[in-house]
Amino acid sequence: MKTTKEWWDKVSKSEDEMVNWLRDQYHGEITAAKRIADSKTNYNISKLEEKLIDSITKDEYRHAKLVKQLLISRNIKPEILTKEERYWNKVLPNVLEENTFTYFCAVGHLAETMRLDRIQLLASDKRFKDIAEVFMSIYPDELFHARAFKEMSTDEDIEKAKKFHNIGMNAIGLLP
């Protein structure tokens, strides 16, 4: 297992790993947008929650577009991958078992918070100006998403979700 910095040091030194990571980012933004949008039909939510979910979904699709442009500028074909979802395979079964919107939001809060560390690191790395610019523009949205999901959840659900979040982080090789 490694820290975000150790992960980025490894990825940023290998063209193949960088390409794979960028493809994963595009895939992740698209699938996140779909997963979040689906929550509107999977749960009985208030108008305010629906408005927040719509806003987050719109942001995730915008992030996907930014990453897609980044891929194209690097002559990499943007595509939705068929791949093992190492983190989500550990986390989503419990979301289905709990089957509440507040638990779904607890998981969203933890996932978005996890991404904030990575995004801050990427946005500050001036070796890759194009990547830094994309992630600087994404950062405020992700900060909002983490806060919004926390507001739509409960402390109890966040505590329950941490167990599976940590298992998911372990599956992707990050320290919880």
Whereabouts are the PLM-identified features?
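Non-heme di-metal
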Residues: 1-176
